[in-house]
Amino acid sequence: MEEHTEAGSAPEMGAQKALIDNPADILVIAAYFLLVIGVGLWSMCRTNRGTVGGYFLAGRSMVWWPVGASLFASNIGSGHFVGLAGTGAASGLAVAGFEWNALFVVLLLGWLFAPVYLTAGVITMPQYLRKRFGGRRIRLYLSVLSLFLYIFTKISVDMFSGAVFIQQALGWNIYASVIALLGITMIYTVTGGLAALMYTDTVQTFVILGGACILMGYAFHEVGGYSGLFDKYLGAATSLTVSEDPAVGNISSFCYRPRPDSYHLLRHPVTGDLPWPALLLGLTIVSGWYWCSDQVIVQRCLAGKSLTHIKAGCILCGYLKLTPMFLMVMPGMISRILYPDEVACVVPEVCRRVCGTEVGCSNIAYPRLVVKLMPNGLRGLMLAVMLAALMSSLASIFNSSSTLFTMDIYTRLRPRAGDRELLLVGRLWVVFIVVVSVAWLPVVQAAQGGQLFDYIQAVSSYLAPPVSAVFVLALFVPRVNEQGAFWGLIGGLLMGLARLIPEFSFGSGSCVQPSACPAFLCGVHYLYFAIVLFFCSGLLTLTVSLCTAPIPRKHLHRLVFSLRHSKEEREDLDADEQQGSSLPVQNGCPESAMEMNEPQAPAPSLFRQCLLWFCGMSRGGVGSPPPLTQEEAAAAARRLEDISEDPSWARVVNLNALLMMAVAVFLWGFYA
């Protein structure tokens, strides 16, 4: 047992802040923001933002490399920098399995799911289920669930992670910094639409990878190279192991020594912190929900100009997903080696002084490396990287939640809303999300940081598997109907809540102060629970479907995988609703078909014209495309739903997919 060091000599949170107050850092940060704003303005000028398809799907004009870069940048938020590095510092390499699992799942998106979404002619995922099953309750349920998850989990994680970095690296006021960050993000999200997001995502992907590569180089140099990491990590333990609290006292070495299996991706199926069956199967289920049916991700794919470009973008994203192991997880482990008394603190009162929370300070691993290792200028670059990740992730949530609310909820309230009204509501929803985000900041700041990364994974495991099951069955089992899908979702939700509510009521605890949640409620690993929940939801869906009337085949053409190439006319189950509405976009028709006949208004003033252009709502004028005829609109709709591929390029992307899977299998085996 280590000797107790005097509490007063423990590192203080305030003593280790490195303020960005030198000209080099400020210049780099300013240049970065000018670059992002410039790219956003450029995309505003060159893209069509005045229509629903142009704003929400970038007009289906994106080539493969911005699609892939945007998929990666939308997925990699500041939560990855803080969370992956922090979990790597705490338990070793296994957390990289969350990233490398996605290599295979993103291929499922490009090859199996995206073709059906395209031929269905949809903008949102609940909209697909509305076409597939009919009825309103599934679509409304998924829209509300998705918005709930966006606001209270994704935004929470990004906000907390950004706050940790700002606290540790800058010393700025948290609220002023995050509000300014949200403001800039909101400006180019509200004004630019999806095309602006995808172009800025592409720029930020290079910023993220470049800055993280530089820090990785500094970190490996400091620790003595790749071999130095694996030689020293198992000995990286804090010297502060005795608490002043008599209830805690001497802390067991089990709580502050690195795990013996820290270097293994695949761990013991019972005693491992990430059991290998759960990592391979349970994580695939949760990842399937995120990569194949989550609005943030799928919306990027639907913007690809062709199915081949979509597949190539998925491959590029997969290759980029190889990098977090080396750019985030291993630097987090190095941070524990270099600063064990801070990053690996275990005494509650010491941890509170170091990072403000008692359960541990592994979340400061990445910010600590930036503060300690990076020289002036490069430290500003790394701040820009973190801001890029945070802004990209938040902007994705803002845009996608705006799409969900506008197309799936608002059109239920105002079925005859015109194109301009929908665009205005979509932008106002973004403003509302920003207000909610800022109001949520005190809750995020008060949360125990050591539990936040596990929190987001656990919440996903309790709520996502029923959605995954329904989407898989919807695409691949034509016999599944609306009753089965709805009751499968509801039954799965009740099962998930039965695990989620007691676990978070009791708290997840820590090694020093374990949770009081009974083992029969909380003892099963959350990824194992995801497997059980997935199969129970799927079984309930199939059982109810087989006991009720099937959906006639005439309603399923190009809505299930086996009928994706069908040329027969489809009778949409939501046709009656669409005929009563003036919104052909709900049937996949192009945005121009949505224009409503409105009385001719007097010419707006110059100020009003500028304001309408800035918000992407101007009509007519120089450079505006003429309205499409009915024949042109039908041709555009067919192009949006086209999944034909050039055979030679199809073979190229297929071979690249096989190559990427081979690389992934090798890396899994090497680190298993």
Swiss-Prot record:
Ranges facing Extracellular side: 1-22, 86-93, 167-173, 218-275, 332-375, 447-451, 506-523, 671-672
Major place of residence: membrane
GO cellular component: apical plasma membrane; extracellular exosome; membrane; plasma membrane
Keywords annotated in UniProt: Cell membrane, Disease variant, Disulfide bond, Glycoprotein, Ion transport, Membrane, Metal-binding, Sodium, Sodium transport, Sugar transport, Symport, Transmembrane, Transmembrane helix, Transport
Reactions listed under catalytic activity: D-glucose(out) + Na(+)(out) = D-glucose(in) + Na(+)(in)
Topological category with respect to the lipid bilayer: Multi-pass membrane protein
Claim: Membrane is one of the keywords in the record: yes
Protein activity control: Enhanced by the interaction with PDZK1IP1/MAP17. Inhibited by natural product phlorizin and diabetic drugs, including empagliflozin and dapagliflozin, canagliflozin, and sotagliflozin. Empagliflozin is selective for SLC5A2/SGLT2 over SLC5A1/SGLT1 and it inhibits by occupying the sugar-binding site in SLC5A2.
Subcellular location: Apical cell membrane
InterPro entries on file: Na/Glc_symporter_sf, Na/solute_symporter, Na/solute_symporter_CS
Positions of disulphide bridges: 255-511, 345-351, 355-361, 517-522
Pfam hit, one: SSF
Glycosylation sites: 250
Transmembrane segment boundaries: 23-44, 64-85, 94-114, 137-166, 174-195, 196-217, 276-295, 310-331, 376-406, 425-446, 452-477, 483-505, 524-547, 652-670
Gene Ontology biological process: alpha-glucoside transport; carbohydrate metabolic process; D-glucose import across plasma membrane; hexose transmembrane transport; renal D-glucose absorption; sodium ion import across plasma membrane; sodium ion transport
Impact when changing residue 283 to M: Strong reduction in D-glucose transporter activity. Impairs inhibition by empagliflozin on glucose uptake
Domain of life: Eukaryota
Cytoplasmic side: 45-63, 115-136, 296-309, 407-424, 478-482, 548-651
GO MF entry, a single one: D-glucose transmembrane transporter activity
Chain positions recorded as Na(+) binding sites: 73, 76, 389, 392-393
Subunit-structure text: Forms a heterodimer (via TM13) with PDZK1IP1 (via N-terminal transmembrane helix); this interaction enhances SLC5A2 transporter activity.
Family: Belongs to the sodium:solute symporter (SSF) (TC 2.A.21) family.
Disease per UniProt entry: Renal glucosuria: A disorder characterized by persistent isolated glucosuria, normal fasting serum glucose concentration, decreased renal tubular resorption of glucose from the urine, and absence of any other signs of tubular dysfunction.
Biological role stated in the UniProt entry: Electrogenic Na(+)-coupled sugar symporter that actively transports D-glucose at the plasma membrane, with a Na(+) to sugar coupling ratio of 1:1. Transporter activity is driven by a transmembrane Na(+) electrochemical gradient set by the Na(+)/K(+) pump. Unlike SLC5A1/SGLT1, requires the auxiliary protein PDZK1IP1/MAP17 for full transporter activity. Has a primary role in D-glucose reabsorption from glomerular filtrate across the brush border of the early proximal tubules of the kidney.
Protein name: Sodium/glucose cotransporter 2
Gene for this chain: SLC5A2
